């Protein structure tokens, strides 16, 4: 399998996007030859070497961030500490939490984030996460070889290059 203008779809997309696809396909060939496999759209590892930190985000986990500028996501609350170390330390010394930003994630936002981040993973998402209105879109992408669907919906190797557009199609149809 060699990356080429034909495999990148030069005839159907602009040259810039085709060149990006060629770059990604060339990288994929080199990484696969070295024993790496993709586990997220733009992340590769040898078996067992996946980044647990990033998987937490993509799998809808929760986390506490410590230190200046650190971000946290607990329950449905997303917040970030103040960025400047001096202000962070002064706030703590004053007995307050150094939170510089906070937001509550709505059910709809949470759902969209689960689909968006989960479909970036090779393991995909539970089929139940996709609304009934988007089933036709999923079926279209399965027929096009970009998704697999069963108990889980996941991008294929070919779909990996188009994951953002696939997610947009699915969420727009729900």
Regions found by a protein language model. Give the residues of each.
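Short, amphipathic alpha-helical interaction segments positioned at domain boundaries
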Residues: 158-174
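Short amphipathic alpha-helical interaction segments
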Residues: 129-144
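C-terminal scaffold of the Radical SAM
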Residues: 1-131
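A short, conserved structural fragment
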Residues: 142-152
């Amino acid at each position: 399998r060699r990356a080429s203008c034909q495999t990148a779809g030069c005839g159907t997309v602009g040259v810039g996007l085709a060149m990006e696809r060629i770059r990604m396909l060339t990288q994929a060939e080199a990484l696969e030859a070295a024993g790496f496999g993709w586990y997220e759209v733009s992340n590769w590892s040898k078996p067992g070497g996946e980044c647990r930190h990033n998987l937490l985000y993509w799998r809808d986990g929760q986390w506490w961030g410590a230190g200046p500028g650190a971000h946290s996501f607990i329950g449905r609350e997303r917040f970030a500490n103040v960025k400047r170390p001096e202000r962070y330390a002064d706030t703590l010394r004053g007995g307050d939490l150094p939170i510089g930003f906070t937001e509550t994630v709505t059910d709809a936002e949470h759902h969209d984030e689960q689909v968006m981040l989960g479909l970036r993973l090779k393991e995909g998402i539970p089929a139940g996460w996709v609304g009934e209105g988007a089933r036709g879109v999923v079926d279209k992408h399965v027929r096009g070889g970009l998704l697999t669907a069963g108990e889980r919906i996941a991008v294929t190797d070919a779909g990996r290059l188009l994951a953002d557009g696939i997610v947009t199609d699915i969420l727009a149809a729900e």
